[in-house]
C-alpha cells in the first residue's frame, strides 16, 4: 500500500487554518478519500492533557518548558496517530507542526534554533510533511478574529510585539533560501487568508492541484 500524504496547516493566530483544515477534510471525505485530521498540541489522550496545560491563561510556563511540552505532545501524536495513518494510506491533515515551533518558541520566545531542531528530531524521528500550507493575513486582523471567537488562551494573550515577530517569522519561512536550509520542514506554500472562507478554500484547493495534479478526485 502506498504511503499517505501529510499536509500541514500553519499560520499566525486568527488566520483561519483550523477552519480551512476542516473544510478540506470534509471535501476530501465526501470524495471517498480516507482522511485523518489532528491538531497540535493534542490529538491523543496525553497530548490533550498537555494542550490543557499549555493554553491555560493562568499557567506560568517558562519558554523552555513550553517548547518541551509541545515536543512531548508531538512525539505522542506522531507515534500513535500520524505514522499509523500514513502507513495505512490515509491523507493526514495536521493543524500546526514544527514550523510553529520555530515561529513561536524560536523567534517568539528566543529559544536557539539548534536546540529546537535537536528536540524535534527526537519528537518526529525524521517525519517530514509532504506540504505545508501557510495561511497569511495582517496580524491585527488575525488577532481580532481570535478575540471574536471568545475568551483568548495563553498563547493568544501574548502582546502585539510577540505576535508581530511570529507573523514575520512565518512569512520568512516561505522563502526558498530558508526552506533549503531547513529540509526537516518540507515544502511550504503561502496561501492568502484574506477574504471569505469559500474564497480562501478555493486558494487551498488550487494549491493542492498545482502541487499534485490528478492526485485528489475532483480537483
Question: PLM features: what roles do these ranges have?
Answer:
Residues 20:
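Hydrophobic positions on the alpha1 helix immediately C-terminal to the Walker A/P-loop
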Residues 9:
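Hydrophobic anchor at the beta1->P-loop junction of P-loop NTPases
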Residues 17:
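Conserved lysine of the Walker
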Residues 25, 140-219:
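NTP-dependent small-molecule kinase module
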Residues 27-124, 201-203:
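ATP-dependent small-molecule kinase phosphotransfer cores
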Residues 2-6:
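Pre-Walker A (Motif I) flank of P-loop NTPase domains
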Residues 101-168:
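A glycine- and Lys/Arg-enriched "phosphate-lid" helix/loop adjacent to the NTP-binding pocket
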Amino acid at each position: 500500500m502506498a504511503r499517505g500524504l501529510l499536509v500541514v496547516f500553519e499560520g499566525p493566530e486568527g488566520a483561519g487554518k483550523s477552519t480551512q483544515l476542516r473544510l478540506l477534510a470534509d471535501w476530501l471525505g465526501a470524495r471517498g478519500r480516507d482522511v485523518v485530521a489532528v491538531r497540535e498540541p493534542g490529538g491523543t489522550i496525553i497530548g490533550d492533557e498537555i494542550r490543557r496545560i499549555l493554553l491555560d491563561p493562568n499557567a506560568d510556563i517558562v519558554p523552555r518548558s513550553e517548547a518541551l511540552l509541545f515536543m512531548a505532545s508531538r512525539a505522542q501524536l506522531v507515534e500513535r496517530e500520524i505514522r499509523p495513518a500514513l502507513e495505512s494510506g490515509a491523507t493526514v491533515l495536521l493543524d500546526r507542526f514544527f514550523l510553529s515551533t520555530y515561529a513561536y518558541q524560536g523567534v517568539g520566545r528566543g529559544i536557539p534554533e539548534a536546540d529546537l531542531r535537536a528536540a524535534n528530531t527526537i519528537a518526529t524521528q525524521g517525519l517530514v510533511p509532504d506540504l505545508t500550507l501557510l495561511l497569511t493575513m495582517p496580524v491585527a486582523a488575525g488577532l481580532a478574529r481570535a478575540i471574536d471567537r471568545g475568551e483568548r488562551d495563553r498563547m493568544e494573550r501574548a502582546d502585539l510585539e510577540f505576535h508581530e515577530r511570529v507573523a514575520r517569522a512565518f512569512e520568512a519561512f516561505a522563502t526558498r533560501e530558508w526552506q533549503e536550509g531547513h529540509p526537516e520542514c518540507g515544502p511550504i506554500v503561502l496561501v492568502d487568508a484574506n477574504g471569505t472562507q469559500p474564497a480562501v478554500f478555493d486558494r487551498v484547493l488550487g494549491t493542492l492541484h498545482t502541487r499534485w495534479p490528478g492526485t485528489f478526485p475532483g480537483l
